[in-house]
Amino acid sequence: MQQWNLLKENVIISVYRKTHEDLVQIFKMERGLVTCTDIDGLMRTLNINHNPLDWRLFIESPKLSLKAVLFHNGNTLPSIPVGHSVHNKESYEIMKIRMEAINYDKFKWKICGDLEVIALLLGLQQRFTKYCCLVFEMDSRALYLHYSRKDWPARKSLEPGIMNVENQPQVELSKILLPSIPLNLGLTKIL
């Protein structure tokens, strides 16, 4: 526009057409999952100092999508999306692929999310479970004990085949931050 003298001389034009090119090499799409494969590279691109102890991984899995976002513990830095997929059913295999793609074993962030996602990460059976509690060995079918018994034994291990544990846990129980209310990336739902 300046070359045709359509703008005044003091007008500055900025072009943002290629700002995404640095990020394209950091993210990879595989089996319908878009995932950041180089978290350190992403942080360098965004000019953020990455200390894994200062971040927590939030995983949300509504009906039609799966999202993974890094939140800063002090909420002074922006949220950083590290994974997204559409039309993938949440399953142990999908979560395992996601955790391997973002190199969770390298960073070992604390994890927060809804109880269904946390149960998947811990390898628990998804439906019709007898021992559905993550922390205690509470029998969900013993309704007569729910209101009379106050002390339930702590869950000793997450061994596959014992007390509704189907798969090997992908994260340590100590890395889980339990939600106080159901969370959503968009809005917080209050029941």
For each feature predicted by the language model, list its residue ranges.
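Electropositive, glycine- and tryptophan-enriched low-complexity nucleic-acid-binding patches
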Residues: 62-100
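Electropositive nucleic-acid engagement tracts
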Residues: 1-50
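Short coil/turn segments at secondary-structure boundaries
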Residues: 12-13, 69-73, 81-83, 136, ...
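Amphipathic alpha-helical interaction motifs in eukaryotic regulatory proteins
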Residues: 2, 96-100, 134
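Short, basic/hydrophobic alpha-helical segments
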Residues: 41-44, 93-107
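Charged (Asp/Glu and Lys/Arg) segments that form or flank catalytic channels of large polymer-
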Residues: 92, 104-191
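Short hydrophobic beta-strand that contains or immediately precedes a catalytic carboxylate
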Residues: 58-59
